[in-house]
Amino acid sequence: MNLKQAKELVRGRLSDKRYEHTLNVKKMAVKLAKIYGEDEERAALAALLHDSAKEISKDEMREILRAYPQYAEGGEERPAPVWHGVCAAILARTQWGVTDEAVLSAIACHTAGKPGMTRLDKILYLADMTSVERDWPGVEKLRKLEKKDLDAAMLAALKQTNDFVLSQGKPLDPMSKAAYEDILACSGQNEMEETAESKGL
């Protein structure tokens, strides 16, 4: 699947608002890919498809997860808000001809993260959180940080997401906690956490 095909596909699957968000995420992902030397076309494709299953019903998502347990990554046992990313990756793999494992990984983990995230995984996760229409408190600080230090930005973003989920009284996806701990455990990550905290994130 090329970028034109992906754009046409999601245009037919998403509401105007969600489609606009998708294009904004694509722009941000490409911008970050340029900064960090990631393949821009890969970043663009992952961004275009990341929410392609966002507006299908939970029942449809459940059917997809059950139909492809080998790709479901924990499936129904994980909180429902993360299902759409996993389902989008499954559809991309099984129905839309996407074979690039890096792209599929980024799509699948863009909501919760996971241990061992690749550079592309991190770029899409951050692009989704900081696309131009996002206006949550602290987003401008994260936009600045992500252009300077990808891992410090990921720590800040994961902490922000996890704190928000817990504040809403909702279950935290174990993958999110594991992703945070994994990045923190890498060499030099204590310094990154201090950097994120010093910037108010």
What are the language-model segments listed below?
Residues 7-12, 30, 35-158:
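Divalent metal-dependent catalytic cores for phosphoryl transfer on phosphate-bearing substrates
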Residues 21:
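N-terminal glycine-rich anion-binding loops that anchor highly charged ligand groups
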Residues 163-201:
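Charged phosphate-binding loop/patch that engages nucleotide di/tri-phosphates or the phosphate backbone
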